[in-house]
Amino acid sequence: MDLSGTRLLKANRATVWAHLNDADTLRAAIPGCETLTGSSEEGFEAVVKQKVGPVKATFKGKVTLSDITPAESYTIAGEGTGGVAGFAKGGAKVWLSDNEGGTELSYTMEAKVGGKLAQLGGRIIDSFARKMADQFFDNFQEQIDGPLDPETDADASPAA
């Protein structure tokens, strides 16, 4: 499953970059994240609870950042196991660029699952991945810009 999208943020690039590397911001942005500890330099440990179709799981895993060009781009990769539910892993390439009065955040991401999760079928997994990506970037944008206004932020929706 591959996804891509763009978000227009009101903050300048330095502020957005700082939030992309901040454990508290990422914890608040990741749907279902119970804990996220660590640093962008050493990597993060995470515990995330999710329900995908009929499968509920608590995933424990690691998130790492690589290919870092400060205030411009990085690659974020994560992998977690959820016991009998299986595993999930994925990554995203994130780019920042200046935009009138703010910052444009662009991303491409991919996700893979195994175990019981993989048995749910591609449509359920694809739909879930899109929902999680949308929710992550909505939450991230709210951490920086404040609550989203559906009318004025309509141009900030992801492209599939």
Residue ranges and their predicted role:
Residues 1-51, 146, 156-160:
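Hydrophobic ligand-binding cavity/cleft-lining segments
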Residues 2-6, 43, 58-60, 73, ...:
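Intrinsic-disorder/low-complexity, polar/charged segments enriched in Ser/Thr/Lys/Arg/Asp/Glu/Gln
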Residues 5-7, 34, 60-67, 90-98:
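Hydrophobic/aromatic beta-strand elements that line small-molecule binding cavities or substrate pockets
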Residues 16, 20, 26, 65, ...:
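Hydrophobic pocket/interface hotspot
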Residues 23, 33, 62, 114-117:
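A short, glycine- and basic residue-enriched loop/turn
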Residues 37-79, 135:
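Glycine-rich portal/gate segments that line the openings of hydrophobic small-molecule binding cavities
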Residues 80-127:
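Beta-strand/loop substructures that line and gate deep hydrophobic ligand-binding cavities in soluble
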Residues 114-159:
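A conserved amphipathic terminal alpha-helix motif
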